[in-house]
Amino acid sequence: MSRRAWLPRGFAVAAASLALLAILSGCAGGPDKPKPTDLGPNAALLDVRQVWTARVGVVGFPLDLKVNGGVLTLADSEGVIAAVDGATGRDQWRTALGAKIGAGVGSDGRYVAVLSSANDLVVLDAGREIWRETLGALGHTAPLVAGARVFVMTADRVVAAFDAQSGRRLWSYSRTGDQQLALRQAGVLLAVGDTLVAGISGRLVGLNPLNGTLRWEAPIANPRGVNDVERLVDLVGRVSREGDVVCARAFQAAVGCVNAARGAVLWSKPAGGFEGVHGDREFVFGTESDGKVIAWRRADGERAWVSERLKYRGLTAPLVAGRSVVVGDAQGFVHFLSRQDGTPLGRMSTDGSAIVAAPVLVGNTLAVVTRNGGVFGFRPE
């Protein structure tokens, strides 16, 4: 099931879930699928121009764009990884792994890590592969590269750490008794101070990055319902981090914020989306499954505004960029909304295929990637 449908994308892990997946996929592709809202004239209140384009192959996995020091690192489904200069769009290096990619990318500016669709963790140094290690399950979350270590989370909810240079496994952490299904979608894995924070089921979990021991758990959503699909509340990337506070979305259940220094839930509010969130010190922004764009007040989670101008357009997770909230859609448009009230400020077109990853800023360039492999750099005048 495509994320670009207004229903959730498919599930993976338990063989018993395949029948459910078929039912849900059929619903998403039926004749009653809502028509994307007409955009109307371009407001053009924000002066933005396209400054470069680049290209990779088709992207059919949950791509996470990584930015380090003015360089954008990305990959395509066939195993090509590229490091692109954010100012010019030119390759700094490009490598073909010879293996299809299932999740990525992770990078600290030197090491780059991806997960292959054959369950391999593959690590490169300066664009050259240095090792690969077979994992026990598929992964859909980009590895985290930090502190000369590579951290991974697989669909069986195992978190593991490897030495970035040698590939030696350092530790692993797993939970028992969690949900039997897992999303075929990027989850949550990031560093906050000296804590590794992972999204496991509906919780943010704080781990010691040196040995994998549990420090705290903070539930953003609790499983509810009578079957495994209804009880699925995995946390989905991207997240919004300001200092020690991390805000995240639980799939089709809630948006909430956690103090990652103390493991304390600050607030959690019902929300019906399946893409991650982004924000600043004042607001947390998210896109709902029907295309609403919502701003929650970061202090208490109360709604500041709701925009319905992009309903059923298959929106990405948002990006806060200056006075704008930026989202991509399934028709290849990049939309700029006012962060204060959601008013449309303008839009840019790409190649007509869906925007497949949340937009990112590379220096003063906004970068987006389409399903057909188009990489576009936009810059405000």
Which functions belong to the PLM regions below?
Residues 23-26:
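C-terminal motif of bacterial Sec signal peptides marking the signal peptidase cleavage site
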Residues 85-88, 125-128, 163-166, 209-211, ...:
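Short loop/turn segments that connect beta-strands within beta-propeller blades
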Residues 30-66, 93-109, 130-146, 169-193, ...:
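Extracytoplasmic beta-rich repeat domains
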Residues 76, 116-117, 154-155, 199-201, ...:
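Structural signature of WD-repeat beta-propellers
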